[in-house]
């Protein structure tokens, strides 16, 4: 990235303001303070859903404790759209998991889920 540094003018020198912060060199765009945080979250999400093969990002965002509960609505939507299976989120496993197995397939850390479906999967339960 080429940063254009203008020579500091007399007022800038007086104030001790670096050339880059001068108003005549406008920053590309003023982001609200929460934007960096939001981008970090999105980057993390895309990292977790990368290689998913389905591009179904929203489903992965279940909290770890949501394992045992019935994920109402999510399954219904999927069945309506004709998608019965999703990919396992565990690296190197990548097996197709039925949408009812949300614990295993979709939550970020569902240790009991791993243990429960270990037979049917290449993945190992996380060491606790």
UniProtKB/Swiss-Prot annotation:
Keyword Amino-acid biosynthesis assigned: yes
GO BP terms in the entry: L-histidine biosynthetic process
Intrachain S-S bonds: none
Superkingdom: Bacteria
Basic and acidic residues bias locations: 34-50, 72-81
Key word Amino-acid biosynthesis present: yes
GO MF annotations, alphabetized: histidinol dehydrogenase activity
Pathway membership, UniProt: Amino-acid biosynthesis; L-histidine biosynthesis; L-histidine from 5-phospho-alpha-D-ribose 1-diphosphate: step 9/9
Keywords: Amino-acid biosynthesis, Histidine biosynthesis, NAD, Oxidoreductase
Catalysed reaction equations from the record: L-histidinol + 2 NAD(+) + H2O = L-histidine + 2 NADH + 3 H(+)
Sequence segments annotated as region (Disordered): 21-84
EC numbers: 1.1.1.23
Cited function: Catalyzes the sequential NAD-dependent oxidations of L-histidinol to L-histidinaldehyde and then to L-histidine.
Family to which the UniProt record says this protein belongs: Belongs to the histidinol dehydrogenase family.
Protein's name according to its UniProt entry: Putative histidinol dehydrogenase
Organism: Azospirillum brasilense
Name of the gene encoding the protein in the UniProt record: hisD
């Amino acid at each position: 990235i080429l940063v254009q540094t203008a020579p500091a003018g007399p007022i800038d020198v007086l104030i001790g303001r670096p050339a880059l912060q001068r108003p005549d060199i406008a920053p590309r765009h003023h982001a609200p303070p929460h934007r960096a945080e939001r981008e970090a979250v999105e980057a993390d999400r895309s990292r977790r859903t990368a290689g998913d093969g389905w591009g179904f990002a929203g489903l992965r965002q279940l909290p770890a404790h949501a394992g045992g509960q019935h994920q109402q609505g999510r399954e219904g939507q999927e069945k309506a759209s004709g998608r019965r299976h999703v990919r396992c989120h565990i690296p190197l496993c990548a097996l197709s998991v039925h949408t009812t197995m949300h614990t295993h397939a979709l939550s970020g850390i569902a240790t009991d889920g791993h243990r429960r479906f270990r037979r049917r999967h290449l993945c190992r339960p996380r060491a606790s």
